[in-house]
């Protein structure tokens, strides 16, 4: 095994693209080495803003390649005595082997002569330039650029390539840039360039040059430094995984600095301050033990500790200016008030074919009112108030500057206007949930507004023909559908998907409602698959998925899944499957008990009627597992019927009546789920 080091040196790579680069380098290098028949023992990929580095252990040479070359049929190549003919000699010569090295193998309907050729692999060092070029060209990013007069495209201008194998320099070039055995240290803190004579020295040499090349090491340094600084002011860091990752890829040599801001800014909404620090400045906010924001924050710099005072002053000056801007917008919004903000939404176009934001609010009110009358009629007036103002903050200065605070600021403005807690919380939370794992709104009013908003969002874009296809979903319709399902599941509302979609009245006809229903069902099925239910299991409840409450569908699935694991499940399944197979190609027939001519028919009919009556109690209380166990008891009666009754009687009336009896039985057996679809 030999160690390889390949470094791509570039201008500052945007932090958001570095995780993509790391995954591509690892996956593509594995694929390329496999194609070159080189064994890959281990691989690590490091990254900083200025470099992407591959470290790997490879076999010293390619594996030999065997190739099978087909020749003529045996009877053409050899005579009856097995002696080679001219064609055998010609084929062997063409392949560079002796006749006695030819083999005979079956192919199609006969035996053919063939040659098995072995090609010895090259030394890894010989093919590495080609491999590394292919690796570089395989990297692809959403935004690529060209620079200078060359044709090379990359995420940022490439400045150098470093390539070593077994501590030997590998010389080649990519688009005129030659590889070296040199790298660059920190842009401002080190003397460049740096000679790398051994692969194992790479990290050590860079660390001395103020570059921590391993992102995991940088992350640990950031976490440790920041927590220690927060402890100095009796606080703790308000961690955010996305921010940690981003900051890790913004610096090569992390140095965390404790900063502060005036207490007066704590009068502003915490979310506003945190958004300014986190999203706009990439600073870490500090909270106390109760989770309240403190007037301190941590900035992670890309320089040495001796520059801390300058960093601190600069960060505090910037955050003060940002907070002043935020305060100005917030106070101006409060002066305008929620009523005026709502009025301003009349002038904001939601979509040229859908009207203004105010028009959207009116649609949300109407959908929310229908939902509320169905689910929480005693709170319909509060629902209408919340729905009326839920989009008002989109006309505010704060949300204009910080769009991620939509809803949250609306909640603050509603609270300031003296609205009930249920209402301002509903406005604040109505964008929730954004996915299956997110929290849903904390009260029913918020859930109703969220459902109404998401239903309108899906309906209007379906009306415009903007239906998601493939992986594309530019308007977040799948996310909206996921949110609807999540609320219906977690709140256990007695709403089916069909009834939920029926709450939409504007912009949709029955055909479009059907399309929307199918779309949401598909999202529900995807969710169920993601939670571990297999496709066949989900098929068993497909007859109910539109017409029964969402949470009930999940309970039915849980029951079938548990029931399937029983030891005696198989005998019931076979009985159900037999019934299903016999009736599946027939139209619906009318049942006439007077045509029964055997005791088995009468017994089965009487059992069905008895079970229908008793099963209702299980279904009504949603005891679906118990219902399946109860139906299981019918198995002997079903088997007895098939053992003694010929369904396909010569008399057409008798035959149809027996099929009608089995159709009647099938309806009963499918009361919980259609078990016949399992296999």
Swiss-Prot record:
E.C. numbers? 6.1.1.14
Q: What catalytic reaction does the record list?
A: tRNA(Gly) + glycine + ATP = glycyl-tRNA(Gly) + AMP + diphosphate
* Gene name of this polypeptide: glyS
Write the protein's name. Glycine--tRNA ligase beta subunit
Q: Name one GO molecular function term.
A: arginine-tRNA ligase activity
The source's superkingdom equals Bacteria
- Which terms are listed as keywords in the entry? Aminoacyl-tRNA synthetase, ATP-binding, Cytoplasm, Ligase, Nucleotide-binding, Protein biosynthesis
- The reply to whether ATP-binding figures as a keyword in the UniProt entry is yes
Check the record and name the InterPro entries matching this protein. Answer: DALR_anticod-bd, Gly-tRNA-synth_bsu, Gly-tRNA-synth_heterodimer, tRNAsynth_Ia_anticodon-bd
Q: Which residues form a coiled coil?
A: none
Q: State where the protein is found.
A: Cytoplasm
One Pfam annotation reads: tRNA_synt_2f
Q: Could you tell me which SMART domains the record lists for this protein?
A: DALR_1
Q: Name one GO biological process term.
A: glycyl-tRNA aminoacylation
Naming one, the record's GO cellular component terms include: cytosol
> For this UniProt entry, what is the primary localization, expressed as one broad class?
cytoplasm
Subunit structure, as described in the record = Tetramer of two alpha and two beta subunits.
Regarding protein family, the annotation reads: Belongs to the class-II aminoacyl-tRNA synthetase family.
């Amino acid at each position: 095994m030999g160690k390889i080091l390949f470094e791509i040196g570039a201008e500052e790579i945007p932090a958001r693209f570095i995780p993509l680069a790391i995954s591509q380098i690892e996956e593509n290098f594995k694929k390329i080495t496999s194609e070159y028949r080189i064994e890959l023992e281990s691989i690590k990929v490091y990254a900083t803003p200025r470099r992407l580095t591959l470290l790997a252990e490879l076999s010293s040479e390619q594996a030999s390649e065997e190739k099978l070359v087909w020749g003529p049929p045996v009877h053409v190549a050899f005579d009856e005595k097995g002696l080679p003919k001219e064609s055998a000699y010609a084929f062997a010569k063409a392949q560079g082997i002796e006749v006695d090295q030819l083999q005979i193998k079956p192919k199609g309907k006969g035996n053919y002569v063939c040659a098995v050729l072995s090609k010895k692999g090259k030394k890894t060092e010989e093919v590495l330039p080609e491999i590394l070029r292919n690796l570089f060209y395989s990297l692809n990013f959403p935004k690529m650029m060209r620079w200078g007069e060359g044709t090379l495209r990359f995420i940022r201008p490439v400045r150098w390539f470093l390539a070593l194998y077994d501590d030997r320099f590998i010389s080649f070039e990519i688009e005129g840039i030659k590889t070296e055995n040199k790298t660059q240290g920190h842009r401002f803190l080190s003397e460049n360039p740096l000679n790398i004579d051994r692969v194992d020295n790479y990290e050590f040499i860079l660390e001395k040059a103020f570059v921590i090349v391993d992102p995991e090491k940088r992350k640990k340094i950031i976490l440790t430094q920041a927590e220690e600084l927060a402890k100095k002011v009796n606080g703790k860091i308000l961690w955010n995984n996305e921010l940690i990752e981003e900051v890790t890829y913004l610096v090569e040599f992390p140095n965390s600095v404790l900063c502060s801001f005036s207490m007066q800014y704590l009068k502003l909404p915490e979310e506003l301050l945190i958004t300014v620090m986190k999203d706009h400045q990439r600073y870490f906010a500090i909270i106390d033990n109760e989770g309240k924001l403190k007037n301190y924050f941590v900035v992670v710099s890309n320089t040495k500790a001796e520059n801390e005072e300058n960093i601190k002053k600069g960060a505090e000056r910037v955050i003060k200016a940002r907070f002043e801007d935020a305060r100005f917008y917030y106070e101006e919004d409060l002066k305008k008030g929620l009523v005026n903000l709502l009025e301003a939404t009349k002038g904001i176009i939601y979509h040229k074919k859908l009207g203004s934001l105010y028009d959207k609010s009116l649609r949300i009110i109407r959908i929310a009112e229908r939902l509320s009358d169905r689910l929480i009629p005693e709170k319909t007036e509060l629902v209408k108030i919340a729905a009326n103002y839920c989009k008002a903050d989109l006309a505010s200065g704060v949300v204009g500057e910080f769009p991620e605070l939509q809803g949250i600021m609306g909640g603050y403005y509603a609270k300031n206007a003296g609205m009930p807690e249920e209402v301002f919380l509903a406005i604040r939370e109505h964008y929730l949930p954004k996915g299956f794992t997110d929290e849903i709104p904390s009260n029913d009013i918020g859930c109703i507004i969220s459902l109404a908003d998401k239903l309108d969002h899906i309906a209007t874009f379906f009306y415009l023909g903007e239906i998601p296809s493939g992986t594309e979903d530019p308007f977040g319709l799948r996310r909206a559908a996921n949110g609807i399902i999540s609320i219906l599941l977690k709140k256990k509302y007695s709403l089916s998907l069909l009834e939920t979609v029926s709450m939409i009245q504007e912009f949709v006809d029955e055909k479009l409602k059907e399309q929307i229903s199918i779309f949401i069902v598909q999202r529900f099925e995807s969710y169920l698959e993601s939670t571990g239910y297999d496709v066949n299991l989900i098929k068993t409840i497909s007859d109910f998925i539109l017409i029964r409450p969402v949470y009930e569908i999940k309970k039915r699935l849980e029951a079938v899944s548990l029931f399937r694991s029983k030891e005696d499940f198989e005998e019931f399944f076979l009985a159900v499957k037999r019934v299903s197979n016999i009736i599946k190609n027939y139209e619906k027939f009318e049942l006439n008990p007077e045509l029964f001519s055997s005791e088995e028919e009468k017994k089965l009919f009487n059992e069905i009627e008895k079970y229908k009556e008793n099963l209702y109690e299980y279904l009504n209380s949603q005891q679906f597992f118990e219902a399946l166990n109860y139906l299981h008891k019918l198995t002997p009666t079903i088997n007895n019927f098939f053992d003694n009754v010929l369904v396909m009687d010569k008399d057409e009336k008798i035959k149809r009546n027996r099929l009608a009896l089995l159709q009647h039985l099938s309806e009963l057996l499918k009361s919980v789920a259609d078990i016949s679809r399992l296999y």
